[in-house]
């Protein structure tokens, strides 16, 4: 979070357990940006990243190894618990429907994010394993790590900048493989005039003209400090559980006094 994470490469996962992923958190919500904005979404946040962006507001250094079967079992309960914890029945529209092959998919989008999800070599096997579990699948990647993403998965490439002393210097261009495969690009935008995040880079405009694919933008949130609830949790707990990482770590109180830089966020938005 805020550039304090450990930086790792694909070698970190070279001895990964078979048919398993290193998972930080899992939660159900509405997708707020990109090609599936407004759609119900099951988020799986994978652990570790090859970058350390100073504005990043998510934790992804801690995690648990989970088998593909364990991930989908937890996904099922996460989706159902979203409504059950509100004292409501799970709506029929999202539940799997019976068909000739058994049960169909959940009517929601699987969003795999991080960290940098493409660091984990087992991810492609999981996406193929779970192809019929969700109506749509999306990966969000910074574009600097190569993997062959299956065609049934929407690849959202969200490029980030190199930094020096916590200040953005220039965009890191996605690899040729990822840029060719990407279904869309997504950029975080800042109102700071001298920041690279103030504009969509020229190469992205050229990519859009050549491919006809979409570019999405979203505002950068600027914080004055770490969220208090997260600081307390990490200070008091010897080890953070999946449930804790999937709730407190993922739900930041925007009403916490002094947390957000309101002036900068107003101009960014």
Where are these regions (language model features)?
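Conserved Radical SAM active-site core
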Residues: 2-28, 40-41, 50-153
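Short, solvent-exposed loop/turn elements at beta->coil junctions and helix N-caps
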Residues: 29-33
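Conserved AdoMet/S-adenosylmethionine-binding subsite of the radical SAM
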Residues: 106-108, 118-269
């Amino acid at each position: 979070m805020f550039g304090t994470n450990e930086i790792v490469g694909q070698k970190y996962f070279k001895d990964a357990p078979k048919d398993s992923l290193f998972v930080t958190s899992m939660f159900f919500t509405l997708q707020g940006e990109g090609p599936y904005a407004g759609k119900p979404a099951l988020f799986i946040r994978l652990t570790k990243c090859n970058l350390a962006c100073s504005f990043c507001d998510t934790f992804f250094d801690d995690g648990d190894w989970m088998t593909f079967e364990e991930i989908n079992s937890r996904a099922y309960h996460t989706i159902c618990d979203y409504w059950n914890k509100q004292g409501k029945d799970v709506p029929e529209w999202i539940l799997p429907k019976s068909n000739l092959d058994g049960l169909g998919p959940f009517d929601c989008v699987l969003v795999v994010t991080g960290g940098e999800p493409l660091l984990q070599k087992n991810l492609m096997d999981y996406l193929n394993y779970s192809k019929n579990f969700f109506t749509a699948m999306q990966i969000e990647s910074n574009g600097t790590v190569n993997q062959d993403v299956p065609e049934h998965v929407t690849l959202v490439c969200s490029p980030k900048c190199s930094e020096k002393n916590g200040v953005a210097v220039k965009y890191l261009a996605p690899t040729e493989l990822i840029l060719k495969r990407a279904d869309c690009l997504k950029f975080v935008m800042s109102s700071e005039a001298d920041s690279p995040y103030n504009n969509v880079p020229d190469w992205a405009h050229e990519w859009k003209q050549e491919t006809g694919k979409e570019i999405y933008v979203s505002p950068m949130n600027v914080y004055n400090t770490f969220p208090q609830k997260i600081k307390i949790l990490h200070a008091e707990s010897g080890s953070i559980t999946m449930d804790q990482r999937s709730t407190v770590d993922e739900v930041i109180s925007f009403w916490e006094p002094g947390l957000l830089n309101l002036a900068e966020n107003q101009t960014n938005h």
